[in-house]
């Protein structure tokens, strides 16, 4: 879900805002107070603060949300940049990652590596911004393990601070063009929060970047794609599916003032969330993933997509 002004946190800057609309002018103090009240309300109800974009809601919450029928389902360009390419590096944050021996780290490295130049990555190629078209290629630089205690997903500033911590330590060198994407995988269970992941934008030391947050989804039915074919652990399969959602949204709608989303604020991943066309999609390195489709205006207009949960046939997965 697209949420879009700029709010500063010391040396950190996070893209902020509400669902795109033409609001009335207000005094800075009133605006700040309103934003703070909204953020606190969202955190108390298990939602991320209003800086988060592309929120991947759980199966149950997504099913209960308005389906978007009645108007045009097409996404439109709101005048911002896209990511013509990307550089990714994952952060595994939390005390339990130090002794972890499962398949999540190697699996997610494989997913990001194989995503580059895959047909799945090409599902976003039709979208353009002020800096050109989204391209299918990217470079994955592996991962970092930080065994300090992780925060949950209620505060985008806390997640950005973790990314900036790794920048300061020299573990991440942000892409100078603003095309760096740094997903943070925590060991914190979702609990009662109504979402599986989100992405946002900010800066570290004056360099713009994209980042994302993910809960530990082990045994989490609300965020489980129910993968029975790839051989991945349930926890990896759940993270892989929501990873596809967030990465493709970041590429087509990375930062203020925003690029591609529909009249309800839904980005390409939101519009096809929890819909799967085939049991698995093969990436460029041969790895296979049960992963949701992404919205394509072209597929919808040409009647070549498969239907989302609202019956709008604009989803594609490149299989």
Where are these regions (language model features)?
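Bacterial N-terminal signal peptides that target proteins for export
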Residues: 1-10
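C-terminal motif of bacterial Sec signal peptides marking the signal peptidase cleavage site
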Residues: 17-20
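Bacterial signal peptide processing site
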Residues: 22-25
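N-terminal carbohydrate-binding/catalytic regions of secreted carbohydrate-active enzymes
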Residues: 41-164
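Loop/turn elements at helix/coil->beta-strand transitions in domains of secreted/extracellular proteins
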Residues: 84-88, 177-182, 207-210, 236
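Active-site-proximal segments of metallohydrolase catalytic domains
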Residues: 133-204
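Metalloprotease/metallohydrolase-associated module, dominated by Zn2+-dependent proteases
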Residues: 195-237, 253-319
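Active-site recognition of the HExxH zinc-binding catalytic motif
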Residues: 241-253
């Amino acid at each position: 879900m697209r949420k879009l002004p700029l709010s500063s946190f010391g040396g950190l800057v996070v893209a902020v805002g509400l669902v795109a609309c033409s609001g009335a002018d207000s005094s800075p103090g009133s605006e700040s107070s309103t934003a703070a009240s909204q953020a606190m309300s969202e955190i108390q109800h298990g939602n991320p603060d209003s800086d988060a974009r592309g929120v991947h809601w759980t199966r149950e919450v997504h099913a209960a949300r308005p389906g978007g029928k009645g108007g045009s389902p097409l996404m439109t360009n709101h005048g911002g940049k896209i990511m013509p390419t990307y550089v990714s590096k994952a952060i595994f944050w939390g005390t339990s990652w130090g002794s972890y021996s499962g398949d999540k780290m190697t699996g997610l490295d494989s997913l990001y590596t194989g995503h580059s130049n895959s047909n799945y990555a090409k599902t976003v190629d039709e979208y353009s911004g002020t800096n050109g078209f989204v391209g299918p290629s990217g470079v994955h630089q592996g991962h970092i393990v930080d065994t300090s205690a992780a925060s949950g997903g209620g505060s985008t500033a806390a997640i950005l601070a973790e990314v900036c911590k790794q920048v300061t330590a020299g573990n991440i060198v942000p892409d100078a063009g603003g095309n760096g994407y740094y997903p943070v995988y925590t060991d914190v269970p979702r609990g009662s929060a109504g979402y599986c992941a989100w992405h946002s934008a900010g800066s570290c030391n004056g360099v713009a970047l994209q980042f994302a947050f993910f809960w530990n989804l082990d045994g989490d039915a609300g965020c489980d794609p129910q993968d029975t074919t790839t051989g991945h652990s349930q926890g990896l399969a759940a993270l892989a599916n929501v990873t596809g959602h967030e990465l493709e949204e970041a590429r087509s709608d990375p930062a203020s003032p925003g690029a591609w989303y529909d009249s309800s604020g839904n980005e390409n991943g939101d519009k096809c969330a929890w819909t799967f066309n085939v049991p698995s999609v093969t990436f460029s390195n041969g790895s296979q993933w049960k992963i949701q489709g992404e919205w394509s205006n072209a597929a919808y207009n040409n009647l070549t997509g498969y239907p989302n949960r609202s019956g709008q046939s604009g989803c594609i997965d490149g299989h």
